[in-house]
UniProtKB/Swiss-Prot annotation:
It holds the Pfam family EFP_N. This is Elongation factor P-like protein. SUPFAM superfamilies: Nucleic acid-binding proteins, Translation proteins SH3-like domain. Coiled coil: none annotated. Belongs to the elongation factor P family. InterPro entries: Elong-fact-P_C (IPR015365), NA-bd_OB-fold (IPR012340), Rib_uL2_dom2 (IPR014722), Transl_elong_fac_P/YeiP (IPR020599), Transl_elong_KOW-like (IPR013185), Transl_elong_p-like_YeiP (IPR011897), Transl_elong_P/YeiP_cen (IPR001059), Transl_elong_P/YeiP_CS (IPR013852). GO terms for cellular component: cytoplasm. One of its GO terms (biological process) is peptide biosynthetic process. HAMAP family: EFP. One of its GO terms (molecular function) is translation elongation factor activity. CDD domains: S1_EF-P_repeat_1, S1_EF-P_repeat_2. It comes from the Bacteria. PANTHER family: ELONGATION FACTOR P, TRANSLATION ELONGATION FACTOR KOW-LIKE DOMAIN-CONTAINING PROTEIN.
Length: 188
């Protein structure tokens, strides 16, 4: 596939790795005979490591077929996470090092997860935009003192810590943005 045919979201092979294209910048410099160049911002699958690479319009890249299977988190088997396909209940097992920091957002029975599969092998997951987690430890609200909002740290039931508004108390369920790791509102 030529570089000028590649779109955002395509998965390609490059430098003995597999990468998903997240952003494309097109430039056509006037001084070099008008050769169009493409700069791809891509992330490794699995791993999510960022890579910037530039290509001429007629450079060839090998496209890789990546399937996204909607799944539900089922259980943890040692250091591995097991997800079940929502359609045919195929189990997908991914090691904790592949899941990485996303493990802090995974709770029993979490739905809306997409397992990314290449050649029938699970390689990565894509979490839902937000998840509901429970606050298990946060300091009490300080009365008076200031009219400004002050965030405070809160430890959640999966072990991660986020900053929450002062009015959030222990035992409360909160929405957490999985892309930024920030408080996104009260659940329920």
């Amino acid at each position: 596939m030529k570089a000028n045919d590649i779109k955002k979201g395509n998965v390609v092979e490059f430098n003995n790795g597999v990468y998903q294209i997240r952003d494309i910048e097109r430039s056509s410099p006037q001084g070099r005979g008008g050769n169009v160049r493409f700069r791809f911002i891509m992330y490794s699958v699995p791993g999510g490591n960022k890579l910037d690479a530039s290509f001429d319009a007629d450079d060839n890249l090998v496209e890789v077929e990546l399937l996204r299977r909607q799944s539900t988190y089922s259980y943890k088997d040692g250091d591995a996470f097991v997800f079940l396909d929502d359609e045919d209940y195929t189990p997908y097992t991914l090691d904790a090092d592949v899941i990485g920091d996303d493990a802090g957002y995974i709770t029993d029975g979490l739905t809306g997860i997409y397992v990314q599969v290449i050649d029938e092998q699970p390689v990565a997951i894509q979490l839902p935009a937000s998840v509901v987690l429970e606050v298990i430890e946060t300091p009490p609200e300080l009365k008076g003192g200031t009219a400004t909002k002050r965030p405070k740290p809160a430890k959640l039931n999966t072990g991660i810590e986020i900053m929450v508004p002062e009015y959030i108390v222990n035992g409360e369920r909160v929405l957490v943005n999985t892309a930024t790791g920030e408080f996104a509102g009260r659940a329920d």
